[in-house]
Amino acid sequence: MAAADDVWCRETVPRVMELVSPRLPQRDACALLAVSPWCYRVLVANPKLWEVLDLREMKNPGDRLISALSLVRYRHLKVLNLEFAQDIEDRHFIHLKEMSGISLEDLEFLNLNACQKISDKGIEAVTSLCPNLRGLSIYWIVGLSDSSIGHITKNCKQILDLNLSGCKNISDKGMRLIANNYQGLKKLNITRCVKLTDDGFQEVLRKCSSLESLNLYALSSFTDKVYKEIGSLANLTFLDLCGSQNLTDDGLACISRCGGLTYLNLTWCICVTDVGVVAIAQGCRSLELLSLFGIVGVTDACLEALSKSCSHSLTTLDVNGCIGIKRRSRDDLIKLFPLLSCFKVHS
């Protein structure tokens, strides 16, 4: 029996832990290290387990990060999540940069969302460590400036996904740096980057022609100069224009040239009428989600156009606040849009 128990502890349990651990949250997988010396050895030797480091919302994230990156098992880290790690500071990244043997060359995605104590200096330090980064999210770090964009474009040449949402001090200068360095950019989120103007963002649209996802939520200063340029993005599938108060039917007609669009948010685009939505219906026949929330200038005519062109793709339609569109029964809606699973209409 003793021999059987020994085999169970040394071989069976560690093997089971190795099979189970990839399906667990990383924090739980780390806890398994303490089960036994045999589990520790088996799990540490599995490189797939240590490609992600998740310090989201953790206390003392800076010290934890430095300690983790000092371990051999994190040498090939691919994903680092520091979202809402509010105590992370510039000094932690600067310390990592100065440490010998620390490299993040395999890192592909870095999430610094809402790390408010990070400044341009911190961005310079951390991006210098990860030259092969492909995705960077710095959502709502309001103190960052165009200098951060300069550091990012200098240090990370392969960025495909960039989230600058809430970075209110980024200006047209930053947009020009993005345009000149990331022609292959796939995803860009500039929600609430309120200093941007048509001139700077048009350069991005002209040079980053591979864009597939574009989030312009709460940018009310852009005009049809920008929206007409969006129509040249042949690969665009996701477009959020919520609050684009200067978007007109002419601009929307140009956007309708993006035939691959599956997601289009036109919430509070108050200048839009049936004319623009009909153009979208005719040009974007793969739409799965469309929000017309709060647009009083649309009527049942646009629903009829959508039912003719998008009836076999549209699953979500929001016409809440569209007083020109009459209420319909569930059965009537299904006749128009057989795949519809979510329909929001005004009371």
PLM segments and residue spans:
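Conserved hydrophobic beta-strand positions in leucine-rich repeat
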Residues: L53-L55, K78-E83, L107-L112, L136-I138, ...
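C-terminal interaction modules of eukaryotic adaptor/scaffold proteins
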Residues: S286-L290, G297, A301-S347
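N-terminal/domain-start segments enriched in small and hydrophobic, helix-friendly residues
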Residues: D274-L292
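Short, solvent-exposed loop/turn at the beta-strand->alpha-helix junction
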Residues: V35, K59-L65, Q86-I94, Q116-K121, ...
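N-terminal adaptor-interaction module of cullin-RING ubiquitin ligase components
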Residues: M1-G101, E105-A114, S119, I123-T127, ...
